[in-house]
A protein has these predicted regions:
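Beta-lactam-recognizing serine transpeptidase/beta-lactamase-like catalytic domain environment
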Residues: 2-12, 84, 234-246, 284-336, ...
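Periplasmic/cell-envelope proteins involved in peptidoglycan metabolism and beta-lactam response
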Residues: 1-308, 330, 350-358, 407-417, ...
C-alpha cells in the first residue's frame, strides 16, 4: 500500500507568514497606541487638572517658613525694678548629623578657639541623649566677642558647627526671688507631649525654653507670647536667596508684682542663717509683700540645664533648699492656732467673751489619768478667752476643744481656708491637713479598724495646734490676714498687673473679696484685741512690744516635733537639732485697717518668741520706712549680667551643700504617724 504525502506549496506558506505578521504588527500598533493614549491622558491630567497643585508643591520646595520665637516677657516688682530679664548673646551649637569625621575631633578644634569647660561638655553630652542628631545642640552658651570672632573665622572648615544669636533669661536677684519667680528650662519631651495634648505645639515653633516652676510656669502663656515667621525663597541646595515676607512675633507680657523688692531683701536679711519661711500679705488686697523660703538656691543654674554635680549638691542637701517652704512646707501651727480656735469657740456659743474657766498647769480627760500639761507648770489660775490668748494657756483650750469636739469645731476653722489651697498664683500649692474622722479613716485605711476610728482624745492636742494639724506658712499668713480684715477674704496673689506691650494694654488683677466670713464683728474685735495684749506686759511676745511706734496684734507658737513622755521635761539641749521645737509667730499691723499680715516659722527654732523679732523687724521696715517714704535706696543686683557669680546655696549661712554632711531627711511634722499622712494627703 502506498502512503500519500501532503506536499505544501511555497505560495501558501508565504501568505500564512504575511497574515501572521500583519496581525502581530496590528497588535503592536494597538499596544503602542494604547500606551501613548494613557501617557497622553496622564499628561493632560497632570498639566491641566493637577497644574495648580503641582505649582503649589513646586513653590513649597522653593519657599519656606522660618519661625521666629517671641521675646519672653519680663517680671518686675511694684516699682518696675526688673526681677527676670532677657539679654542677647552668642551660642556655640553643633548639629551632629552634619559633622564630617569624628565629633570628638571637631570638639577638640573648638576647645582651641573657646574656653569650653568640663561643665559645658557634661551638659552637651546630656543634651545629646535628649536631642535628635539633626537638631542644634548647644556646646557653649554665651560666647565672648573674641571667642565668637575666632570661631566665625573657621566656620568654613567646621561643617555642622554654628554660632547663633540667642536671647538668654536671667534672674538678677538670684536666690532672693528663686522660690516664687521659679525658672525656665529647655523644652523636654514631656513638655512637648503636654503642648501637643493641649494643641499648643504650634505656638512653640522656634522656641527652646518653657516655664518650669514658680511664676514662670503659672503665667507661661502670658510670658511666652506668640511666634512670628519669615517667608524665604531657597535655591536647590537649601540656601536662602531672599526674604519674601516677615510677620513679627508678639512678645510676651510683663508681669508686675505687688511686692517691693526692698521689702523682700529685708525679709531675706532677717532670715539669713535660719531654716524656715517668712511670708507677708496685704490684708486689704491679698497682694503678697514678701515671700522667703530659706535656704534658697540660684535659679540661674537651671536655665540651660543644671550639671549633675550641682544637681546632686542641691537635691541631697539635708536642708532641702529646693523645697518651697512657703507653699509646700507642712508644719503643726502650735499656739498660733489659738486665735482661730477662739473665733470658733465664740461663734459656736461654747463660751462668751466674759466666760472665765480654770487654766491649771495640767488637765486630764474626765475618767482618765493621762495628764495634758501646760507650758507653764503652775498654770494661769482662772482665765477668760482674752487672757488665755495673751498668756497662751494650753489647758484652757484643751478642755474647751475636747468638750466641743472636732466635728462641731471644724466648720469654723475651715472658713479660714485651713486644709484648703489659698489659690495663690503659683503651681503645686499644698492644701495642708485640717483633720476629721473621715480624713483619718481614709488616711489610715490599711490599719486595723480600732486604729482608724477617731478617738475623742485626739481633739486635745488639735485644740492647741498640734496633733494631725499641718499647714503651710502661706495658709497661716492668709488666715491671719482674714482675721485682721474682719473676715473679708482675699485670694493671695503675687502679680497685680499684666502689661501687654503689643496692644499697649494694662490688665489689673482686681483684688475683689472672695467672700466675707459670717462671723460677728464683735468677736473679731475681741480676738484682735487679745492678740494686741500678746505684745504687752504679761504677753508671750512682750519683748517686741517695747518701743513699738504703731499698734500690732500677734501670737506666738511653739510646735512640737517629737512628743515628750509623761513626767519628762522638754530639754532642747538634750535633743538633736532636727528634733527641737519649731518657732512660730503670726502678726498684723496696724490694728486699724491693717496693711500687713505676717507669718514666720523657724524650723527647730525653739520658743515662738524667738520668731517674733523677725516679724517686728519686717513690719517696722514696711510701715516706718517703705510706707512713709523713708527708704530711697536703689536695690542692688546680686551678680553681674552674664556670669553666674552667686554661690549654689544662699541664705543658710553654711558652706556649699556638696561640702555638707547629708543627715536626716527634711522634717515638717512632729508626729511620726502623722508625718507620712500629711505629706501625701496635703499635696494637691
Amino acid at each position: 500500500m502506498k502512503t500519500l504525502r501532503h506536499i505544501s506549496r511555497p505560495g501558501n506558506d508565504n501568505a500564512s507568514i504575511q497574515r501572521d505578521f500583519r496581525i502581530r504588527l496590528l497588535a503592536a500598533f494597538l499596544f503602542i497606541f494604547l500606551l501613548f493614549s494613557i501617557l497622553a491622558a496622564r499628561f493632560v491630567h497632570l498639566q491641566i487638572y493637577k497644574r495648580d497643585e503641582f505649582t503649589a508643591q513646586a513653590a513649597s520646595n522653593r519657599i519656606s517658613l522660618i519661625p521666629t520665637a517671641p521675646i519672653r516677657g519680663e517680671i518686675v516688682d511694684a516699682n518696675g525694678v526688673v526681677l527676670a530679664r532677657n539679654y542677647p548673646a552668642y551660642s556655640l551649637e553643633i548639629i551632629p548629623s552634619q559633622i564630617k569625621g569624628k565629633l570628638d575631633d571637631t570638639i577638640a578644634v573648638l576647645k582651641t578657639l573657646a574656653d569650653i569647660t568640663e561643665s559645658d561638655l557634661n551638659r552637651f553630652q546630656k543634651f545629646r541623649t535628649e536631642f535628635r542628631s539633626y537638631e542644634k545642640i548647644p556646646l557653649k552658651l554665651k560666647l565672648t566677642p573674641d571667642e565668637a570672632s575666632r570661631i566665625a573665622a573657621r566656620l568654613y572648615a567646621l561643617p555642622g558647627v554654628e554660632i547663633n544669636a540667642r536671647t538668654f533669661r536671667e534672674y538678677p536677684y538670684g536666690e532672693l526671688t528663686a522660690h516664687f519667680l521659679g525658672y525656665i528650662g529647655r523644652i523636654s519631651d514631656k513638655d512637648q507631649a503636654k503642648l501637643a495634648e493641649e494643641k499648643l505645639g504650634s505656638l512653640y515653633r522656634g522656641s527652646t525654653h518653657i516655664g518650669k516652676s514658680g511664676l514662670e510656669s503659672f503665667y507661661e502663656r502670658q510670658l511666652h507670647g506668640l511666634p512670628g515667621y519669615r517667608e524665604v525663597e531657597k535655591d536647590a541646595y537649601g540656601n536662602i536667596i531672599r526674604t519674601l515676607r516677615t510677620v513679627p512675633p508678639q512678645n510676651g507680657q510683663t508681669l508686675k508684682l505687688a511686692m517691693d523688692i526692698r521689702l523682700q531683701q529685708e525679709a531675706v536679711r532677717l532670715m539669713r542663717g535660719k531654716r524656715g519661711a517668712m511670708v507677708a500679705i496685704n490684708p486689704q488686697t491679698g497682694g503678697v509683700l514678701a515671700f522667703v523660703s530659706n535656704p534658697s538656691f540660684n535659679p540661674n543654674l537651671f536655665i540651660d540645664g543644671i550639671d549633675s554635680e550641682n544637681w546632686k549638691a542641691l537635691n541631697e542637701n539635708w536642708q532641702k533648699p529646693l523645697i518651697n517652704r512657703v507653699t509646700q512646707g507642712l508644719y503643726p501651727p502650735g499656739s498660733t492656732f489659738k486665735p482661730f480656735m477662739a473665733m470658733a469657740l465664740l461663734e459656736s456659743g461654747k463660751i462668751t467673751q466674759s466666760s472665765v474657766i480654770p487654766a491649771p498647769g495640767a488637765w486630764s480627760i474626765p475618767g482618765t489619768k493621762h495628764m495634758f500639761r501646760d507650758s507653764v507648770r503652775s498654770g494661769h489660775g482662772s482665765a477668760n478667752l482674752s487672757k488665755a490668748i495673751q498668756v497662751s494657756s494650753d489647758t484652757f483650750f484643751y478642755r474647751l476643744g475636747f468638750e466641743m469636739g472636732i466635728e462641731k469645731i471644724r466648720p469654723y476653722l475651715a472658713e479660714f481656708d485651713f486644709g484648703q489651697q489659698t489659690g495663690i498664683d503659683l503651681p503645686n500649692e499644698y492644701r495642708g491637713v485640717l483633720p476629721s474622722p473621715e480624713w483619718k479613716e481614709k488616711r489610715f485605711s490599711k490599719l486595723p479598724p480600732e486604729r482608724r476610728r477617731w478617738n475623742t482624745a485626739e481633739m486635745v492636742p488639735i485644740s492647741i495646734g498640734q496633733g494631725y494639724n499641718a499647714y503651710t506658712p502661706l495658709q497661716m499668713a492668709h488666715a491671719t490676714a482674714t482675721l485682721a480684715n474682719n473676715g473679708v477674704v482675699y485670694r493671695p496673689h503675687l502679680v497685680k498687673e499684666l502689661l501687654d506691650h503689643n496692644k499697649q494694654q494694662i490688665t489689673l488683677i482686681d483684688p475683689k473679696p472672695q467672700r466675707i466670713l459670717p462671723f460677728k464683728q464683735s468677736n473679731f474685735n475681741y480676738v484682735k484685741a487679745a492678740m494686741a495684749k500678746v505684745l504687752q506686759p504679761g504677753g508671750t511676745a512682750r519683748k517686741i512690744g517695747v518701743g513699738l511706734k504703731y499698734s500690732m496684734g500677734g501670737k506666738t507658737g511653739t510646735a512640737q516635733v517629737v512628743q515628750i513622755a509623761q513626767g519628762k521635761n522638754y530639754n532642747a539641749a538634750a535633743l538633736a537639732e532636727q528634733h527641737r521645737d519649731h518657732a512660730w509667730f503670726i502678726a498684723f499691723a496696724p490694728m486699724e485697717k491693717p496693711q500687713i499680715a505676717i507669718a514666720v516659722i523657724l524650723e527647730n527654732g525653739g520658743w515662738g518668741a524667738n520668731a517674733a523679732p523677725l516679724a517686728r523687724g519686717l513690719s517696722d521696715y514696711y510701715l516706718l520706712k517703705l510706707k512713709s517714704g523713708g527708704d530711697h535706696d536703689i536695690p542692688v543686683d546680686n551678680r553681674n549680667k552674664t556670669g553666674v557669680e552667686n554661690p549654689l546655696l544662699a541664705g543658710s549661712g553654711t558652706v556649699r551643700p556638696s561640702e555638707n554632711k547629708i543627715t536626716e531627711a527634711f522634717r515638717t511634722i512632729h508626729n511620726p504617724e502623722a508625718a507620712h499622712s500629711a505629706a501625701s494627703e496635703a499635696a494637691p
